[in-house]
Amino acid sequence: PATGAVLAKASSPSYTHADLGTIIESGTGSQLVDRTTQALYSPGSSFKTITLSAGIDTHTTTLDTTYSAPGTMELGGGTIHNYANEDMGTIPLREAFARSSNTALAQLGVALGADNLVSYARAFGYGTALGQDFSTTPSLMPNPAEMTTWELGWASCGLPVGEHASPAGPQTTVMQNAVVAAAIANGGVVMNPYIVDRVLSPEGAVVSTTSPKSLGQAVSADTAAQVREAMLGVVESGTGMGARVPGVKIAGKTGTADVENGNFNSFFIGFAPYDHPTLVVSVVIEGNGENVLGYGAQVGGRVLAQCLNIQALGAAS
């Protein structure tokens, strides 16, 4: 989180050199797309991390502010609903975030306003071609002047529903989601990711070294600390319990986004260890006809556990 160094990334489906000719001839090319950096996704509730950050940073809300979180509600001439239309009653924001209430977070987004929501998304990297030594498709947000109240409510929950000249948003890459989680773990400072640590000559001499590069302070350190606390609640007692790892505190945020043909994608962003984060993970599992509800958190937890073990072995060697 403190440097932006990318330790690993994986995209599936992939390909081998032997398959390349067949893939090109088929004209599909799906395997050639690096889904970590080039594919844009509706982030679902993982975007609520930005909504919560903006709400706290602008003093629009606090973690203890209570919200009515009905199963469905009318907003701006349209309907906002929780998953399975669950009525959560009147609850504090920290619980609404942990349980991922759309109706509560939509109210926060409307109170925040479109200008603020889009501005904070951009502060976290939206609209930027992230990467010091690789290319990333910029994540998208609408022109705030074109957003309706209903669209703003859903955008605050990570679902792009707008139809206007500017792109519907939010739309994000897996890498952008990692940058958001890393910024929260890093006291609100956004780091530009990179893959190559250093370049060596054939003789082993250091030719160049990549220096960490900040993209700015998205939110204050105090705001980041409060959002970290809320993200801990997601994994400890909310929708992200599947990411729990024995003996390690993990903080994160889940997300689910409907896609075409009744499918949906499962997201998880998180970091560990909670008190002194050294690792960040960003996961999207595409449904493609399978029920992947909650699977993003399970995969994220397993990835963090394995990487923490590797770090521990490296420190001990």
Language model region names:
Residues 1-45, 50-285, 292:
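Beta-lactam-recognizing serine transpeptidase/beta-lactamase-like catalytic domain environment
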Residues 205-211, 297-317:
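Short, gly/Ser/Thr-rich active-site loops of penicillin-recognizing serine hydrolases
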